[in-house]
Amino acid sequence: GAGSRTTSFLVDDDVLIDAGTGVGELPLARLARIDHVFITHAHLDHIACLPLLVDSVGDLRPTPVTVYATDATLAVLRAHIFNWAVWPDFTRIPSPESAFMRFCPVVVGEPVELPGGRSITPLPAYHTVPAVGYHLAGTGGSLVFSGDTTSHPPFWQAVNSIPDLTHLIVETAFGDEEIALARASRHLCPSLLAEELARLNKRPQLWITHLKPGQFELIMEQVGRLAAAYSPRLLTHGQVLEF
């Protein structure tokens, strides 16, 4: 989104949704409080800071950082990131019995229960690699993040089943001038987003994220015109949402 950082959302003090370059804004003391990292998919803009995060805080924590993702995404992280060639395998450092990181597979539709009565549920998404969105259930409402996706009816079916949806964060990577590229790369553009929103049977606050650098104004003008009924707003760096 605006601010030229890649995707990462801090939830309370202890949960991270994706680990893009936005993580680098947090001081070490706050990084050390992150217990849970939920990854939508394995593309670099969503995992760039994960290796550095675990390396930085591993010996500052009494327990490992738990990384949640689908089996397919965890397999990519094992094979291509934490493989000793690109980065050490922190699921085995300093030992397999007392590692700095552990992997936990997630399944679409199955909630992960967290302390404090919170839960996070993977949602179906459709991208060039296996991907999910996430539904975050809080005490006063819910938030949904689409992750990277293109048109995908199962995502909207899942969203429509959430009774207390407060915030909906959806990617819109390209302007309509690049609709062919949006389709090929399995992202959304404003006209595709408008078609998808027609499937939505509720009116949460709509936030737009994952915009192509240099095209924020163009994309938001198009989104504002094509999806005006949803009062879309640009999600900006450092913004705080309550639910």
Whereabouts are the PLM-identified features?
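Pre-active-site segment of Zn-dependent metallo-hydrolases
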Residues: 1-42, 48-62, 154-161
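Short, well-ordered alpha-helices that flank and scaffold nucleotide-derived cofactor binding pockets
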Residues: 52-55, 79, 195
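Glycine/small-residue-rich loop that forms an oxyanion/phosphate-binding "nest" at active or ligand-binding sites
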Residues: 54-55, 60-71, 104
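Glycine-rich phosphate-binding loop signature in dinucleotide/nucleotide-binding domains
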Residues: 31, 114-115, 138-140, 161-163, ...
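Anionic-ligand binding region
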Residues: 131, 143, 149-153
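Active-site neighborhood of phospho(di)ester-bond hydrolases with catalytic His/Asp-centered motifs
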Residues: 17-20, 35-45, 68-70, 144-149, ...
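Cap/insert and terminal regions of metallo-dependent hydrolase folds
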Residues: 152-242
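Metallo-beta-lactamase
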Residues: 72-131, 139, 229-242
